[in-house]
């Protein structure tokens, strides 16, 4: 087994809690997201999956890169915000990762996106990169 979904599913099999908060190695949760998670999960017990907004920043990004990749950049320099990611899931056997690349979760029956208002404005994942790393990553994904 050698693709991303397989690796993530192996990690899921090791989890013992009611929910799993799975983030990539280069993502950081905001402090507000960490603080609000217990209350969020307790008050919405029927949701099996949560979509979390992600703040992407790319140091060295130029207008040429933005045009080449068709990205949107807001006034804060955030790329493609809110860029929702499936990162919080109920720990049940039906929910698994699928696809070798650009993997996605399957097997859930209900989901909700964290809103961008109502006190959730600062609840997001932080995903910083450099342009060199972004170009290398794009080239890698093109080979898969």
Model-identified regions with their sequence ranges:
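Walker B catalytic motif
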Residues: 25
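Catalytic-site signature of metal-activated, phosphate-bearing donor transferases
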Residues: 5-13, 19, 28-144
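Short, acidic/turn-prone active-site loops that include or flank metal/cofactor-
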Residues: 1-2
């Amino acid at each position: 087994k050698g693709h991303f979904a397989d690796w993530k599913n192996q990690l899921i099999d090791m989890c013992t809690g009611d929910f799993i908060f799975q983030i990539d190695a280069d993502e950081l949760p905001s402090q507000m997201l960490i603080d609000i998670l217990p209350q969020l999960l307790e008050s919405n017990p029927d949701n099996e999956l949560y979509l979390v907004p992600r703040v992407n920043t790319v140091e060295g990004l130029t207008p040429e890169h933005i045009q080449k990749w068709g990205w949107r950049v807001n006034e804060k320099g955030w790329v493609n915000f809110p860029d929702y990611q499936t990162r919080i899931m109920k720990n049940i056997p039906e929910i698994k990762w699928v696809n070798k690349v650009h993997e996605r979760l399957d097997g859930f029956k209900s989901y909700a996106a964290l809103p961008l208002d109502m006190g959730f404005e600062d609840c997001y994942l932080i995903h910083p990169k450099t342009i060199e790393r972004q170009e290398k990553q794009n080239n890698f994904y093109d080979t898969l």
